[in-house]
Amino acid sequence: MPGDFFSYHLDVYPGFKVLSLSYRKGRCDGRTFSMQIYLPDEKDGLPAMLEMLASTPEDEDTPSYRADIGELKIPRFKFGYHFEATEALKSLGLSLPLERIFHKSCIQVDEVGTEAAAAAADVSVGACGPAEKKYDFVADHPFLFLVKEWRSGVVLFLGQVLDPSMH
């Protein structure tokens, strides 16, 4: 995973923050993917954040602003999921050349993949005026994550980390 991410930013919303980690663009088709981590401000705030996200209409913008990152910590995590897709595909009217079809997916984030983002978090550009407030993003309590393709809006992975014990 080293070098998978090429840019990142933090958006601050009322009650939660979203860290967006952009992956490199696809070589052939130019699609852009990113991982987003939704971290509630409160340690036990995941259910309330999910309720707020689910109840906000898609065309209604939740007020937010781009913020500078102070401390950045993301735990390592790995999830996998598999299921037999045969019946689901047949119900879509597809004729299958095989008797059974299985789907398996997994996602892994570790310190190698997040270290590059954290190392760049302290880089600053000289400027006049007062320093902007920096917001810490320390995912030491339950959070939501997703991997999304931006052109289509398709979410490829979606999950929750309920016990993000930091290593």
What are these regions (language model features)?
Residues 1-167:
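Secretory/exported precursors with cleavable N-terminal leaders
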